[in-house]
From Swiss-Prot:
InterPro entries: GIY-YIG_endonuc, GIY-YIG_endonuc_sf, UPF0213_domain. This is Putative GIY-YIG domain-containing protein 242L. CDD domains: GIY-YIG_UPF0213. Residues 5-81 form the GIY-YIG domain.
């Protein structure tokens, strides 16, 4: 069975400047869940939260999870570049960074 595309990667900035990376098939709904203290435990009490970036491309769940893992391993500097440049193709961007 082939999986439908529709997953996005997103980054949330906490008030202390830390960046959380996650995946969702509905980024705005997931961000709202985080803001209401019902999402990831590591974000609870760390607000105000800011949805800093999310991928424009829709990935399969597997691709999104793999890219999320790759982004989480990056330095804060690289994550801030993705946010600042509003990277549209994060996969290509990261492949260029890892060479």
């Amino acid at each position: 069975m082939e999986e439908k595309n529709g997953w996005n990667i997103y980054m949330v900035t906490m008030k202390n400047g830390n960046i959380y990376t996650g995946i969702s098939n509905n980024v705005l709904k997931r961000f709202d869940t985080h803001c209401n203290g019902k999402g990831a435990k590591c974000l609870r009490g760390k607000g105000p939260l800011k949805l800093s970036w999310f991928s424009k491309a829709n990935y399969s769940h597997g691709e999104a999870a793999s890219l999320e893992y790759t982004i989480k391993k990056q330095t804060k500097k690289v994550k801030l570049q993705i946010i600042k440049l509003n990277v549209l193709d994060v996969k290509t961007f990261l492949n260029g960074k890892m060479k």
